[in-house]
Amino acid sequence: SYRPWNILDTNPDLFNRMIAVNTRAPFFLIQDAAKIMIRENIEGRIINIGSMSEQAGQPFLCPYSTSKGALATLTRNVGFALMRNRIHVNQLSIGWMNSDHERKLIESETGDPNFIDRKAATKPFKRILDPKEVAKAVLWMASEDSGMMTGTIVNFDQSIWGAYDDAPSPENALDLPI
């Protein structure tokens, strides 16, 4: 079952799993793809999927946010490193998305099957991201229409990072794990 993890109660196993999935795997997949593309003289595009949580993230997502922050740095670094090989590396960093997985996760946490719909109604666009619009954004980034963009992080959410009516802050102090 899902459990939030903050800086005080994240264990090494969870931290290593987050890094393995969100940082290590993309690192070596990009490495293998780049070697093939360079050897075969292929111009192309690599698109990473990031998260708005990479910017700092919610306290209860500390290992996840850390791993996605590392992915953003990898994207910018490799986008620069491979540009003379005509390999574009960019990232779409998505916000809260209305996926089947997210619905199941939120319902298991809250017991409320309508939680997402109620919260989405309070958002500026009265909804959260749809997986189909995320897919369309990735298709655009992978197409020639994205031009020479490389090493770029595109934040795909209904907020502007750093622009708040009232700056967010944690609701409570952290408690030491039991």
Regions found by a protein language model. Give the residues of each.
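Substrate-binding pocket helix/loop in short-chain dehydrogenase/reductase
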Residues: 5-7, 14-16, 119
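C-terminal substrate-recognition "lid" of short-chain dehydrogenase/reductases
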Residues: 27, 127-156
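Active-site helix of classical SDR
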Residues: 30, 67, 75
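Alpha-helical segment proximal to the catalytic Tyr-Lys
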Residues: 35, 80-81, 147
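Residue(s) in the substrate-gating loop at a strand-loop-helix junction
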Residues: 51
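Short, small/polar-rich loop/turn modules that mediate ligand/substrate recognition or access, typified
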Residues: 83, 88, 149-151
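Short C-terminal tail/terminal secondary-structure segment
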Residues: 150-178
